[in-house]
């Protein structure tokens, strides 16, 4: 390990943790109406009864926690997906998991009128699980292992079909369209904490599972044959990883909608900072992705309050960063 990577690793986790704390604080303080820190502290401590405290507790706190939860889930899911498919361009939408969750939520709203947090979460998990099973069955090969190429092709094809069906159902049902048009664009505009309580435990379990897979992912990143030779149980790692992706993507999609791009970009940034060792890159991804999502949400709230979606802002911020990382890697490999 080079000295520069060792130094970067020593400062990356505490530095990103500080950045995440700053993003969380700013998310509570800044919006269409900026609030003093004293009001935020009083609201969080339960000693304030003013209208400003209502803004903090009913609007900013839920969306801040949603950004933390969904950001961490999407970042870890992206890192897992890039390893399972051995595709550096993979993101949580590549295997059709996001599309499956979105389709199931829209279908539930159109056919059964599902709109509560529990109902949407159940539909999101069901859709994500069915999509994962279809893709895994299509992408499987001998020995129970998954073929990265077949997995990617099956995921892209399934996502295209489900996205078309989702759009068709929403357009043919005005009530569903009005209910879900902002959600489908990706938004942290969560108005209560109950929605987050529903997904908290599944996300924590799946996130912890992803972190525990770090050693196995290091072996798997070298290829299935090499991982098997090193004693890694490839099929088991792939199955557990796919289940973790399903839970992480299903939970995030149920809460904030299908937010793309950050699950693609942040694992690249993490590997650029601390190297390809997943024991380091996964924790860095877990800290950096929510920070980016919160900063994107803050910018959207300030520029066009209530209209500019966080998914658009995160893509606008992240695209130049991803281009920089790709060009730097290309030059380094030249």
Task: Give the location of each predicted region.
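Alpha-helical transmembrane segments in inner-membrane proteins
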Residues: 1-334
